[in-house]
Amino acid sequence: GIDYIAASFIRDGKAVEEIRELCVLNGGEHVTIFPKIECALGVENFDEILEASDGIMVARGDLGIEIAPQLVPHIQKEIIRKCNDAYKPVITATQMLDSMQHNPRPTRAEVADVANAIYDGTDAVMLSGESAAGMYPVEAVKMQASIALETEKYLADHAPLVVPEGASTTRAVNNVVGLSAVNMATTIGAKCITVPTTTGRTARLISHFRPNMPICAFSRHEWAVQQMIMYWGVQPHLAAITQGTVNGTIMKAIETAKELGYVNPGELTVATAGDPRMCVQAEGKFSSTNVAYVAQVR
């Protein structure tokens, strides 16, 4: 089965809901839908599209044809900001390293374009013609990856903790625990944040605070692991972490993180988990993550 659908020329939220209904009817309830924002109506109705979707793709090629190209940069920034505030992943795509279809090295402007999308908060950058039909597909992938790694290294050293709009005042327990975990990990110098998760939701929330250490996430569901690949800073692993108790689950997750090399004996990690006996219910919804745990690895 597939993991994602990138839906072209989405104009409103209803179109996303129709795609989701088709997925569910055909056994694809875990398929994530990324509408491609590439027309004027998609921009105009963006808020309802974002509400209905699992993430967004900024498809700048057609968008720059459908609307004035000089409007694309600030629309891109606004879309990324809104996705960050909604804790939903965003992909920036099209013509990022376009000259590498014919040349082994990008222009400096293209390098800056990729880096600036990452500075703005994009979760992923995507190649299209460069890797699909270009003369240097492998070189293009390696170049984009190297730009991303260097940019993230700079952000880890210089950028402050990112707090999406409303996150510091929200009373949603999942968000509060996620932000607290990142604050603790940053303050104590933790080597990683360890996240046992069923659906990947907690990893997604923590991802959007942009911590400067890896988010080591474990799920027993392959579909959840595949989805978490798209989240900024998350290193997802397929593993049966859940034990009979919350403490047992946390200890198993930390031990697995140690085995994978994310944290060594004597170093610190912060783990999140959910204790179902004390889950907080508000407005008819359960907050599944209600524990943040500091541990020194043995």
Regions found by a protein language model. Give the residues of each.
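Non-catalytic helical/linker scaffolds that mediate oligomerization, partner binding
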Residues: 1-298
